[in-house]
Curated annotation (Swiss-Prot):
Gene Ontology MF, one: tRNA binding
Naturally occurring in which organism (per UniProt): Streptococcus uberis (strain ATCC BAA-854 / 0140J)
Name of protein: Small ribosomal subunit protein uS7
Function in brief: One of the primary rRNA binding proteins, it binds directly to 16S rRNA where it nucleates assembly of the head domain of the 30S subunit. Is located at the subunit interface close to the decoding center, probably blocks exit of the E-site tRNA.
Keyword Nuclease (UniProt): no
Superkingdom as given in the UniProt entry: Bacteria
Keywords, ordered alphabetically: Ribonucleoprotein, Ribosomal protein, RNA-binding, rRNA-binding, tRNA-binding
Source species taxonomy: Bacteria, Bacillati, Bacillota, Bacilli, Lactobacillales
Length: 156
Protein backbone atom coordinates (compact mmCIF):
# COMPACT_ATOMS: atom_id res chain seq x y z
CA UNK A 1 0.00 0.00 0.00
CA UNK A 2 1.22 3.51 -0.77
CA UNK A 3 2.71 5.44 2.11
CA UNK A 4 1.83 8.77 0.56
CA UNK A 5 -1.24 10.80 1.44
CA UNK A 6 -4.57 9.86 -0.06
CA UNK A 7 -5.20 11.62 -3.37
CA UNK A 8 -7.76 14.42 -3.02
CA UNK A 9 -11.27 13.68 -4.29
CA UNK A 10 -11.76 15.38 -7.63
CA UNK A 11 -15.13 17.00 -8.21
CA UNK A 12 -16.85 16.14 -11.50
CA UNK A 13 -18.46 18.94 -13.48
CA UNK A 14 -22.17 18.66 -14.31
CA UNK A 15 -22.84 17.68 -17.91
CA UNK A 16 -23.88 20.49 -20.28
CA UNK A 17 -27.20 18.98 -21.44
CA UNK A 18 -28.87 17.90 -18.18
CA UNK A 19 -26.70 19.89 -15.74
CA UNK A 20 -26.33 16.77 -13.61
CA UNK A 21 -23.21 15.35 -11.97
CA UNK A 22 -24.55 11.80 -11.94
CA UNK A 23 -24.99 11.93 -15.74
CA UNK A 24 -21.33 13.00 -16.04
CA UNK A 25 -20.34 10.04 -13.87
CA UNK A 26 -22.42 7.74 -16.09
CA UNK A 27 -20.64 9.11 -19.18
CA UNK A 28 -17.27 8.53 -17.48
CA UNK A 29 -18.29 4.97 -16.59
CA UNK A 30 -19.45 4.21 -20.18
CA UNK A 31 -16.27 5.73 -21.65
CA UNK A 32 -13.67 3.33 -23.07
CA UNK A 33 -10.11 4.27 -24.10
CA UNK A 34 -10.65 7.94 -23.18
CA UNK A 35 -13.30 8.47 -25.88
CA UNK A 36 -15.57 10.79 -23.96
CA UNK A 37 -17.34 12.15 -27.05
CA UNK A 38 -18.40 8.65 -28.06
CA UNK A 39 -19.52 7.88 -24.50
CA UNK A 40 -21.51 11.12 -24.29
CA UNK A 41 -23.21 10.33 -27.62
CA UNK A 42 -24.16 6.86 -26.35
CA UNK A 43 -25.61 8.23 -23.09
CA UNK A 44 -27.52 11.12 -24.72
CA UNK A 45 -28.90 8.83 -27.46
CA UNK A 46 -29.99 6.35 -24.78
CA UNK A 47 -31.72 9.18 -22.89
CA UNK A 48 -33.55 10.33 -26.05
CA UNK A 49 -34.64 6.70 -26.64
CA UNK A 50 -35.95 6.57 -23.06
CA UNK A 51 -37.86 9.84 -23.57
CA UNK A 52 -39.47 8.49 -26.77
CA UNK A 53 -40.31 5.11 -25.23
CA UNK A 54 -41.71 6.29 -21.89
CA UNK A 55 -42.90 9.81 -22.63
CA UNK A 56 -41.38 10.90 -19.31
CA UNK A 57 -38.29 13.01 -18.68
CA UNK A 58 -35.26 10.77 -19.24
CA UNK A 59 -33.38 12.22 -16.25
CA UNK A 60 -36.27 11.36 -13.90
CA UNK A 61 -36.42 7.80 -15.28
CA UNK A 62 -32.64 7.50 -14.83
CA UNK A 63 -32.80 8.78 -11.24
CA UNK A 64 -35.62 6.34 -10.43
CA UNK A 65 -33.53 3.54 -11.95
CA UNK A 66 -30.50 4.54 -9.87
CA UNK A 67 -32.62 4.53 -6.68
CA UNK A 68 -33.70 0.98 -7.55
CA UNK A 69 -30.12 -0.15 -8.27
CA UNK A 70 -28.12 1.46 -5.45
CA UNK A 71 -27.48 -0.95 -2.56
CA UNK A 72 -28.08 -0.05 1.09
CA UNK A 73 -26.13 -2.99 2.59
CA UNK A 74 -23.19 -5.06 1.42
CA UNK A 75 -20.91 -7.67 2.97
CA UNK A 76 -17.25 -7.15 3.81
CA UNK A 77 -14.82 -9.95 4.64
CA UNK A 78 -13.53 -9.71 8.22
CA UNK A 79 -10.95 -12.07 9.68
CA UNK A 80 -11.69 -13.04 13.28
CA UNK A 81 -9.88 -15.81 15.12
CA UNK A 82 -8.50 -17.54 12.06
CA UNK A 83 -11.71 -17.63 10.01
CA UNK A 84 -13.20 -15.18 7.56
CA UNK A 85 -16.70 -13.85 8.15
CA UNK A 86 -18.86 -11.99 5.67
CA UNK A 87 -19.93 -9.04 7.80
CA UNK A 88 -22.89 -6.93 6.60
CA UNK A 89 -22.17 -3.19 6.59
CA UNK A 90 -24.06 -0.12 5.41
CA UNK A 91 -22.84 1.37 2.13
CA UNK A 92 -21.62 4.97 2.17
CA UNK A 93 -23.57 7.33 -0.15
CA UNK A 94 -20.63 7.88 -2.54
CA UNK A 95 -20.04 4.13 -2.84
CA UNK A 96 -23.78 3.51 -3.35
CA UNK A 97 -23.71 5.72 -6.44
CA UNK A 98 -20.46 4.19 -7.70
CA UNK A 99 -21.74 0.62 -7.31
CA UNK A 100 -25.07 1.54 -8.90
CA UNK A 101 -23.39 3.04 -11.97
CA UNK A 102 -20.93 0.13 -12.23
CA UNK A 103 -23.70 -2.47 -12.06
CA UNK A 104 -25.85 -0.53 -14.55
CA UNK A 105 -23.09 -0.26 -17.16
CA UNK A 106 -21.89 -3.86 -16.67
CA UNK A 107 -25.46 -5.17 -17.01
CA UNK A 108 -25.92 -3.01 -20.13
CA UNK A 109 -22.76 -4.39 -21.71
CA UNK A 110 -23.91 -7.96 -21.03
CA UNK A 111 -27.28 -7.47 -22.78
CA UNK A 112 -28.09 -8.78 -26.24
CA UNK A 113 -29.28 -5.67 -28.11
CA UNK A 114 -27.23 -4.49 -31.09
CA UNK A 115 -25.92 -1.09 -30.01
CA UNK A 116 -24.72 0.13 -26.63
CA UNK A 117 -27.24 2.98 -26.63
CA UNK A 118 -30.10 0.46 -27.01
CA UNK A 119 -28.66 -1.74 -24.25
CA UNK A 120 -28.19 1.20 -21.88
CA UNK A 121 -31.67 2.60 -22.59
CA UNK A 122 -33.35 -0.79 -22.06
CA UNK A 123 -31.38 -1.49 -18.87
CA UNK A 124 -32.27 1.95 -17.43
CA UNK A 125 -35.96 1.43 -18.29
CA UNK A 126 -35.87 -2.08 -16.79
CA UNK A 127 -34.20 -0.76 -13.63
CA UNK A 128 -36.81 2.00 -13.34
CA UNK A 129 -39.45 -0.78 -13.40
CA UNK A 130 -37.53 -2.79 -10.76
CA UNK A 131 -36.50 -5.52 -13.20
CA UNK A 132 -33.27 -6.25 -15.06
CA UNK A 133 -29.83 -7.59 -14.24
CA UNK A 134 -28.61 -4.53 -12.33
CA UNK A 135 -31.58 -4.66 -9.91
CA UNK A 136 -31.02 -8.41 -9.51
CA UNK A 137 -27.39 -7.67 -8.56
CA UNK A 138 -28.62 -5.33 -5.82
CA UNK A 139 -31.15 -7.91 -4.58
CA UNK A 140 -28.40 -10.57 -4.46
CA UNK A 141 -26.17 -8.20 -2.47
CA UNK A 142 -28.99 -7.50 0.00
CA UNK A 143 -29.77 -11.23 0.31
CA UNK A 144 -26.12 -11.94 1.08
CA UNK A 145 -26.13 -9.23 3.77
CA UNK A 146 -29.38 -10.60 5.23
CA UNK A 147 -28.03 -14.17 5.26
CA UNK A 148 -24.94 -13.03 7.19
CA UNK A 149 -26.84 -10.90 9.68
CA UNK A 150 -25.62 -13.12 12.51
CA UNK A 151 -22.13 -11.69 12.03
CA UNK A 152 -23.26 -8.05 12.22
CA UNK A 153 -21.71 -7.72 15.70
CA UNK A 154 -18.25 -8.06 14.07
CA UNK A 155 -18.67 -4.64 12.44
CA UNK A 156 -15.68 -2.39 12.96
Amino acid sequence: MSRKNQAPKREVLPDPLYNSKIVTRLINRVMLDGKRGTAATIVYDAFSTIKEATGNDALEVFETAMENIMPVLEVRARRVGGSNYQVPVEVRPERRTTLGLRWLVNASRARGEHTMKERLAKEIMDAANNTGASVKKREDTHKMAEANRAFAHFRW
